[in-house]
């Protein structure tokens, strides 16, 4: 069985033979694409009369090849993906004027150390061990939210500075993806109701039994449940929760989509950080991990900062150099 590097070369050299005749003169390339927490390798097949082509990520196709060990079958799957993605791309014609973009830019948080390569190519600013990046929301429908990461080139070509993106995104995120703080009880009850569980059964299970606020877990996300960890940047929500609980908070980054807030009386931050690390490594996919650290919110100072400092391992478990600065910085570019 060929390794992944050889697989990429074989696909690149042979894919045109598996595509329809109109692709005969297409140009083929394979290139690395920095994504959140990882780098993927994409195949592009550019038709002669087009100025863009979809990325077909080869990691997934390589998994298919490992399962069937038949390169011809896999090439046929890749070809089908190319044709389908090219058709879909032709249907999408987003308006790229500056007004449309500035009204639909939202905040997203990623881990700084794990995303060094990605951060070279995108406008960003540091926040503790994380970085704020920006996504342009192209469409929202019943299937979810379609968005793209804004790159340096994209921003420069449309006249946006990082500061302008930040200011637009702070306001837009509250409108497009309103922050939401709910107790874990409420979240579990909502999920159970969505699954059709009767109210009476939920009550008999004690789902609605009152738990003191300082003993509860609180989920900080947004109404979409997508990239909701950025909601921790809205300090007024943290302050309101801390006042309700009556103590400072520890924030546990469960994924890029949400964080869990608890009273500081719930345990030592080092213990909580170990729990976050263990969950990250066993239950959260690499592309959705945010941090192995825990954050402390001081309700009197109204300040959010790191409670722990465990940068010795990246989110993929690889030993990493410790970042030198954890304080919030100004625009990175």
Task: Give the location of each predicted region.
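N-terminal alpha-helical "arm" segments
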Residues: 1-36, 41
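Short amphipathic alpha-helix segments
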Residues: 229-242
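A short linear hydrophobic-aromatic micro-motif
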Residues: 247-251
């Amino acid at each position: 069985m060929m390794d992944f590097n050889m697989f990429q070369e074989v696909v690149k050299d042979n894919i045109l033979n598996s595509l329809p005749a109109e692709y005969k003169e297409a140009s083929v390339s394979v290139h690395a694409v920095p994504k959140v927490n990882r780098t993927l390798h994409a195949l592009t097949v550019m038709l002669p009369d087009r100025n863009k082509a979809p990325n077909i990520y080869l990691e997934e196709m390589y998994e298919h090849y490992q399962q069937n060990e038949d390169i011809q079958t896999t090439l046929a799957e890749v070809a089908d993906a190319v044709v389908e993605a090219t058709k879909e791309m032709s249907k999408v014609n987003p308006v790229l004027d500056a007004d449309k973009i500035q009204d639909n830019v939202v905040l997203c948080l990623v881990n700084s150390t794990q995303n060094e390569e990605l951060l070279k190519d995108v406008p960003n600013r540091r926040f503790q061990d994380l970085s704020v990046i920006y996504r342009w929301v192209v469409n929202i429908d019943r299937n979810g939210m379609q968005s793209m990461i804004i790159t340096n080139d994209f921003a420069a070509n449309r006249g946006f500075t990082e500061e302008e993106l930040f200011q637009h995104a702070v306001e837009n995120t509250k409108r497009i993806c309103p922050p939401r703080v709910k107790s874990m009880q409420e979240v579990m009850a909502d999920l159970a109701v969505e699954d059709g569980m009767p109210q009476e059964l939920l009550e008999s299970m004690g789902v609605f039994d009152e738990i003191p606020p300082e003993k509860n877990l609180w989920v900080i996300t947004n109404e979409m449940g997508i990239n909701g960890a950025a909601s921790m940047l809205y300090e007024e929500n943290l302050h309101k929760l801390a006042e309700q609980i009556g103590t400072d908070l520890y924030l546990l980054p469960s994924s890029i989509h949400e964080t869990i807030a608890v009273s500081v009386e719930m345990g030592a931050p080092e213990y909580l950080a170990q729990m976050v690390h263990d969950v990250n490594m066993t239950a959260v996919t690499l592309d959705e991990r945010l941090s192995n650290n825990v954050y402390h919110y001081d309700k009197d100072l109204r300040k959010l900062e790191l409670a722990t400092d465990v940068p010795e391992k990246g989110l993929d478990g690889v030993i990493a150099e410790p970042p030198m600065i954890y304080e919030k910085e100004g625009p990175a570019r």
